[in-house]
């Protein structure tokens, strides 16, 4: 009898779960497009607003009395002055193009090859991932910390916006795409940063406040991860001290400003770690109280990657409110460049608006939603928590040594530990002198000279790496496509 009763109870419980209604988001074609446009526009506005301060305030915030400019013609000015500023956008565009041409079910390998052979400048985890793929190291190995010391950097985080836009209110689908894309260049907290951003955008289509958006987005990141703990600290701190964002900034500085991986930032005040910069995103969303202007201003004034962070904040709020509700003060300068083509792509903002809209509708239908007669219905499903992955566990940098020398033949050094990173640049002396290179590179720790080659210089330096008398591997360092880190 006891067994029969138990079976009956389980059967009744299962029937009860199946009977629970699924929450559905209903909106019109026009409303969906408006939100998608708002995401792209807010993202681009944020990256331009933070342009003059990017990594110029490391270990400090920007004082309230210091003006940050914005005016008519300002977006066009930065478009012409520094095309590489828009890496937040053109990396997204590469993947949007890939999904458009290869289909929504395209493989990780197909996406990796599109990314690795895109003709624009990359840095940090993106550049290391590109190098790995071009050497035959495919994802997820290309983003693994043992092959990519930038694995915890925020690269995937700054190019994951498009995922939430093509998967509106569809968190499980957003995380599936994030897993395919994010492990091309990142892993661990670096991967979680992009998954978090994708979830922020996706949930912004139906959540009504920054608090709710953050709560939903962080719920998919494993609680055991340092990324989750860092973002949760921001949420908890804000609940206790909701008035002054600088108090939260100091708290984060003390507890979480500790990068152990990025070769450019280790032992320095430069921090491009995903969790710290995502924490600044969360901080700005909470203390900005949903106001577009205040939120991107706070995200910028937090410092470090102060163009990418307001870019994410602006994009998420752009989705929540929609394109038409972004203040004209911000939107009008953007409209000047909406038809301009991003570097290394065939994409403009105008094309991105439409392409993301089309992809979103395809994915909605594919996953059981409805698109009919100008009306859209999206079933909102619970997403599973991502698997736990952590980089650099029980691994810490021991020392940083500065050499400031040219490698023209051989270079030898001794080290203690289980690994090393040599960080530098390959430079062409056709147009500049070794003296100039030396003066720039020794200006301060972290100074670098961009690879000044002809635009299509085919030269590739071959550098043999020998360890304990045995050839470990041969590094191929191209002059083309911007700087090539040793």
Task: Please report, for each region that a protein language model flagged, where it lies by residue.
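Catalytic phosphate/nucleotide-handling subdomain of diverse soluble enzymes
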Residues: 49, 56-69, 186-189, 197, ...
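A structural-propensity feature for long, helix-poor, extended segments
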Residues: 74-95, 338-368
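Glycan-recognition surfaces in beta-rich domains, encompassing non-catalytic CBMs
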Residues: 373-483
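Bacterial Sec-dependent N-terminal signal peptides
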Residues: 1-21
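Alpha-helix capping and helix-loop boundary segments enriched in small/acidic/polar residues
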Residues: 32, 80-86, 120, 145-152, ...
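Accessory "access/gating" subregions that flank catalytic or transport cores
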Residues: 27, 133-134, 142-151, 162-170, ...
